[in-house]
Amino acid sequence: DGLMLGNVLGEEFLTWLWFQSDVAPGAFVNKEGQPFSVSMEQRIVVQGGEGDTRETASVAGTLSPLTEARFGLGKGKKVTRATIRMEKDELAFQFTLSADDFTLGSMKLPKVEKPEEDDDPDAMLLERFYLMEVCLGLLESLYASFLRLRLSAAWGETVQEITAWIRRE
């Protein structure tokens, strides 16, 4: 079953990430081998068709299993954008990722404590930069894991598992 062959890597990545986060949300590790969890949150956009026949379905819901979007995958639509939540230790990051150009949007970082009066005035800004770097590092490790799998002989089996997951109610 060539479910994903010939598709854009970004669409495959988001589909794989949704699958993995659904079946094993805590099975991710960063470059240092430290575990973190991933979940698809609140909103997924799937598209199918070409030109004038292009259809888009945007599924949103705070605690929704996003069944309609998964149904769209079963009908040949592809994940084009998703809201992703990553948690490592006490840090939680949330952002929207676009499949076509890997654009990040609506990034929510962990709260940063307001500096004391005698602290460095740039401390808060530097802390936010650091948190963005942590978030991007986690995302980079996810994509590296995906690419290792995608370029391996195990990818065919993974496609079968994803297909079964899509068809599951």
Give the ranges of each region predicted by the language model.
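Intrinsically disordered, low-complexity, charge-rich terminal extensions
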Residues: 1-169
